[in-house]
C-alpha cells in the first residue's frame, strides 16, 4: 500500500506501459530498450508520443527501482507536476505502469485506488491467459493489447467504476464474501455435493462449483454485506480470490452479468455520430459512442447477409438495454426497439405456477449464461470460457468454465478440459435441474425475507447504526457492509443513457418493416433457443402487449441488511471514506508486518471510527453514535486513542466497548461466521 498525494478525476488516466528490462548493464541503445517495451497505450490521442519519449519513461522507472533502498518493493510511485506514475513489479521481471494526470481543480482519487486496479488488471490477465513468462514476446504483446487496452479503456470511459468499491481496492488481495446467516439451512449445499460432485460421472470432471450472490443494480437494494461469494467446494482452488474479484469487476463496470459480458463481447467505445460496426479483425471504427462486438460487418441486403447483420446486432450488449425504459420513456421511441430486442432473447424457464399466496412474488428466472447450448453460429466464447487456473499447488493450466444463474445467484462450474460430458445436451439439462433444486432451496431458506417485506423494512431497527469491514488474513476473505461509492457528477452518469439509445436504434434498423408487436407474438412463443441470457429480473421490462404476464410488483422480497451509511448522501459518504482511507494508510506498515494496533477516532462528520489490526484480522467499524441515544453520553466524552498493546480478545478492549452495546452484541454473533469459514 502506497502513500502519496491524490489526483484529479473526471478522466484521470493518461497512459499504461508494460515492459520487461533486459539483462544488459550500463547505457543501452534505443534499439535494445525498444525490445523491452511490450505495451504503450495512451488514452487521449492529443499528441503523438515519440518512441524516444516512451523509452525515456522506461528509463525513469528502471532508475527508480535501481536506486531504491528496498529492491523487494512491488509498487513504487513517481510524482511530477504533470503526472504521477504508479508502477507495480510482477513475476520478478515485468513492470506495469499507469500514468495519472494531475489536476488540483478536479475531485481527487487517492493513489491506492489506482494501485488496486493495477493489481487486479494483472491478476485478471493471468487467470484468462496465464503468466507473462509463459509467452513469447510477440504473443504476449498481442494478449496485452487485447486485455489491458480493453480493461483500462472501460475504466477510462466509465470513470465512476474506478471508485465504486472504494475501500475494497485497498485490500486487492482479498475477495468479497456474502454475509449470510451462519445458522441458515445448509440443505442446498448437500444437494450440490450429493447430486453433482460425488457422482461417478462428475467426480473427475467437475473441479469446483462456485456460488455467488450478485444482486442487480436494478433490484431492490438489500445491502452490500449480502454481495459476494456464498460458497465454493474445493479448498485447493488458489485463484478463488482473483476469479471472484474478476466477476465483481465486470459487474461493477457493466452493471449486470450477461452472456455478452462473460464472453467479453462488449466494451465501451467513445464516438460521436452514426452507429458503426467493427471489422472482421475486431478493430474498432466509426464516430459514435457505442458498445460493440467482434462480428463481421456487411453492407449487402441479401438474406444471408441480413442474417449476419442480425447476429451482429444480437450480440450487442443486452446488459444495458433495460435501464433505457425508465430513463427516456416513450418520447425517445426506444420502447419499440427494446421490445424488438426482447423478442430475440431466448425463453427463460420458470418455476411451476405459483400458488395464490405467491402471486406477488416474481417468478424465478434461471438458466445458462455460458454453455454449449448456445446457438451454433455464436462464437465459442459463448459456449464455454477457457480460463487458466491454479489448484493445489499445481502449475496454472486451462479449464473449461460454464456459467449458470438463478435470479441474482450466479453459479460457476469449473471443469477439466477432458470432461466431454458438457457437450451433451442431456447432461446439461440434467445439470440444470440439479442446480435449480439446490439454489431454489438457498433462496427460500437464506435469501428470501419471509415476513411481510414492506412492513418489515420500515422498522427503525432494520437500519443498523454501524458499518463494518473485516479481512481474514489467513484466507484472504473480506466481509463488508460499506455501500458502493458514487464519486463523479451526473455528467458521467449520462453515459449509460446515450449508449442505450444507440444500441436500441441499431436493433430497430435491423428489420423496420416488421413491427415490435408482431415479433413479440411470433418469437417469444417460438422454440428457438439462442443460448443468450442475462441475470436479474427483466419481467417488468417487457412491453405491455407481451404475451408473457407481468406483475405490478416485480420486486423480489429479499432479506435486507442496511446500515446508516446506505442513507447518507454521496458527498458525506465520500468524505467519510477518504478519512477512513487515511486512517488505514497510517496502519500500512503494521498491517504488512502484523504489528498489533488499535485506534478509536472521530471523523469530521462526528462518526466514530474504530480500527484494529492483528495477525488474523483487520477490523474497521464506523459507528453513528449520534442516533444511539442510549450511548450518547459516553461517546461524547471520548477522545481519540491509539493503543499498541492490548487484550488478545477484541471484546475485552476498552476502545471497542466505546462503540456501544449494539456493536458488542453484533460482534459476539458475527464471530461465528469467521469461525465457520476458518473450519
From Swiss-Prot:
Would I find Transport among this entry's keywords? yes
Instruction: Tell me where the transmembrane regions lie.
Output: none
Q: Name one GO cellular component term.
A: vacuolar membrane
Q: Which InterPro entries match?
A: Ccz1 (IPR013176), CCZ1/INTU/HSP4_longin_1 (IPR043987)
> Which Gene Ontology molecular function entries are recorded, alphabetically?
guanyl-nucleotide exchange factor activity; phosphatidylinositol-3-phosphate binding; phosphatidylinositol-5-phosphate binding; phosphatidylserine binding
Q: Per UniProt, which keywords does this protein have?
A: Autophagy, Endosome, Membrane, Protein transport, Transport, Vacuole
- Compartments where found: Endosome, Multivesicular body membrane; Prevacuolar compartment membrane; Vacuole membrane; Vesicle
List this protein's GO terms for biological process. Answer: autophagosome maturation; cytoplasm to vacuole targeting by the Cvt pathway; late endosome to vacuole transport via multivesicular body sorting pathway; protein targeting to vacuolar membrane; vesicle docking
Question: How does the entry describe its membrane topology?
Answer: Peripheral membrane protein
Functional summary from the UniProt entry:
In complex with MON1, is required for multiple vacuole delivery pathways including the cytoplasm to vacuole transport (Cvt), autophagy, pexophagy and endocytosis. The MON1-CCZ1 complex acts at the fusion of vesicles with the vacuole, through its regulation of the SNARE complex during the coordinated priming and docking stages of fusion, and particularly at the stage of tethering/docking.
Q: Which family does it belong to?
A: Belongs to the CCZ1 family.
Subunit structure of this chain's protein? Forms a complex with MON1.
Q: What is this protein called?
A: Vacuolar fusion protein CCZ1
Amino acid at each position: 500500500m502506497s502513500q502519496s498525494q491524490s489526483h484529479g478525476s473526471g478522466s484521470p488516466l493518461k497512459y499504461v506501459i508494460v515492459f520487461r528490462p533486459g539483462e544488459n548493464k550500463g547505457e543501452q541503445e534505443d534499439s535494445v530498450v525498444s525490445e523491452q517495451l511490450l505495451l504503450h497505450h495512451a488514452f487521449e490521442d492529443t499528441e503523438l508520443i515519440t518512441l524516444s519519449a516512451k523509452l525515456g519513461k522506461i528509463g525513469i522507472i528502471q532508475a527508480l527501482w535501481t536506486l531504491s533502498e528496498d529492491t523487494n518493493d512491488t509498487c513504487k510511485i513517481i510524482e511530477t507536476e504533470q503526472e504521477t506514475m504508479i508502477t507495480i513489479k510482477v513475476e520478478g521481471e515485468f513492470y506495469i505502469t499507469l500514468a495519472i494526470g494531475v489536476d488540483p481543480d478536479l475531485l481527487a482519487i487517492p493513489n491506492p485506488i489506482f494501485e488496486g486496479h493495477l493489481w487486479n488488471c494483472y491478476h485478471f490477465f493471468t487467470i484468462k491467459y496465464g503468466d507473462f513468462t509463459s509467452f513469447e514476446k510477440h504473443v504476449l504483446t498481442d494478449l496485452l493489447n487485447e486485455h489491458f487496452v480493453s480493461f483500462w479503456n472501460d475504466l477510462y470511459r466509465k470513470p465512476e467504476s474506478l471508485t465504486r468499491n472504494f475501500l475494497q481496492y485497498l485490500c486487492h488481495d482479498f475477495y468479497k464474501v456474502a454475509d449470510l446467516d451462519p445458522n441458515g439451512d445448509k440443505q442446498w449445499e448437500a444437494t450440490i455435493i450429493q447430486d453433482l460432485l460425488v457422482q461417478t460421472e462428475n467426480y473427475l470432471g467437475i473441479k469446483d462449483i462456485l456460488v455467488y450472490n450478485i444482486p442487480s443494480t436494478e433490484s431492490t437494494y438489500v445491502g452490500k454485506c449480502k454481495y459476494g461469494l456464498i460458497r465454493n467446494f474445493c479448498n485447493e482452488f488458489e485463484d478463488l480470490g482473483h476469479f471472484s474479484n474478476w466477476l465483481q469487476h465486470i459487474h461493477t463496470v457493466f452493471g449486470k452479468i450477461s452472456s455478452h459480458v462473460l464472453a467479453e463481447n462488449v466494451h465501451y467505445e467513445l464516438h460521436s455520430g452514426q452507429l458503426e460496426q467493427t471489422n472482421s479483425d475486431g478493430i474498432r471504427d466509426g464516430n459514435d459512442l457505442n458498445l460493440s462486438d467482434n462480428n463481421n460487418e456487411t453492407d449487402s441486403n441479401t438474406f444471408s447477409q441480413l442474417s449476419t447483420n442480425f447476429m451482429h446486432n444480437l450480440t450487442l450488449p443486452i446488459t444495458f438495454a433495460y435501464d433505457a425504459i425508465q430513463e427516456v420513456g416513450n418520447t425517445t421511441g426506444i420502447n419499440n426497439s427494446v421490445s424488438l430486442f426482447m423478442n430475440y432473447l431466448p425463453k427463460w424457464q420458470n418455476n411451476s405456477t405459483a400458488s395464490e399466496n405467491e402471486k406477488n412474488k416474481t417468478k424465478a428466472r434461471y438458466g445458462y449464461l455460458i454453455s454449449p447450448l448456445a446457438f451454433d453460429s455464436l462464437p465459442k466464447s459463448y459456449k464455454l470460457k477457457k480460463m487458466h487456473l491454479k489448484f493445489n499447488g499445481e502449475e496454472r493450466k486451462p479449464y473449461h468454465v460454464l456459467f449458470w444463474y438463478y435470479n441474482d445467484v450466479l453459479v460457476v462450474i469449473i471443469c477439466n478440459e477432458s470432461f466431454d460430458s458438457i457437450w451433451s445436451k442431456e447432461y446439461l439439462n440434467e445439470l440444470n435441474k440439479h442446480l435449480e433444486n439446490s439454489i431454489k432451496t438457498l433462496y427460500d431458506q437464506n435469501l428470501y425475507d419471509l415476513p411481510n417485506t414492506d412492513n418489515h423494512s420500515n422498522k427503525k431497527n432494520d437500519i443498523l447504526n454501524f458499518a463494518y469491514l473485516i479481512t481474514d488474513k489467513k484466507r484472504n476473505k473480506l466481509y463488508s457492509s460499506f455501500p458502493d461509492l458514487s464519486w463523479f457528477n451526473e455528467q458521467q452518469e449520462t453515459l449509460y443513457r446515450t449508449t442505450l439509445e444507440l444500441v436500441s436504434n441499431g436493433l430497430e434498423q435491423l428489420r423496420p418493416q416488421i413491427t415490435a408487436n408482431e415479433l413479440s407474438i411470433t418469437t417469444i412463443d417460438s422454440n428457438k433457443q439462442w443460448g443468450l441470457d442475462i441475470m436479474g429480473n427483466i419481467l417488468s421490462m417487457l412491453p405491455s402487449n407481451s404475451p408473457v404476464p407481468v406483475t405490478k410488483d416485480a420486486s423480489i422480497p429479499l432479506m435486507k441488511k442496511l446500515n446508516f451509511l446506505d442513507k447518507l448522501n454521496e458527498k458525506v459518504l465520500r468524505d467519510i471514506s477518504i478519512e477512513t482511507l487515511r486512517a488505514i494508510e497510517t496502519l500500512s506498515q503494521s498491517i504488512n508486518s502484523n504489528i498489533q494496533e488499535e485506534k478509536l477516532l472521530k471523523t469530521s462528520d462526528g462518526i466514530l471510527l474504530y480500527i484494529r489490526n492483528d495477525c488474523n484480522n483487520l477490523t474497521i467499524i464506523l459507528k453513528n453514535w449520534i442516533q444511539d441515544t442510549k450511548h450518547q453520553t459516553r461517546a461524547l466524552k471520548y477522545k481519540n486513542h491509539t493503543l499498541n498493546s492490548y487484550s488478545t480478545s477484541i471484546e475485552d478492549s476498552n476502545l471497542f466497548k466505546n462503540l456501544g452495546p449494539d456493536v458488542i452484541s453484533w460482534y459476539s454473533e458475527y464471530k461465528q461466521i469467521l469461525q465457520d469459514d476458518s473450519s
